[in-house]
């Protein structure tokens, strides 16, 4: 598992939820 990729995914999800 790639934690970095997971972070990006979480960040993208959070950005989507914010907007």
Curated annotation (Swiss-Prot):
Residues in the signal sequence: none
This protein's GO CC annotations: extracellular region
Subcellular location per the Swiss-Prot or TrEMBL entry: Secreted
Top-rank lineage group of the source organism: Eukaryota
Iron keyword on record: no
Family according to the record: Belongs to the cationic peptide 04 (cupiennin) family. 06 subfamily.
Tissue-level expression: Expressed by the venom gland.
Taxonomy of the source species: Eukaryota, Metazoa, Ecdysozoa, Arthropoda, Chelicerata
Disulphide bridges, residue numbers: none
Keywords assigned: Secreted, Toxin
Name the UniProt record assigns to this protein: Short cationic peptide-6b
MF annotations from Gene Ontology: toxin activity
Keyword check for Secreted: yes
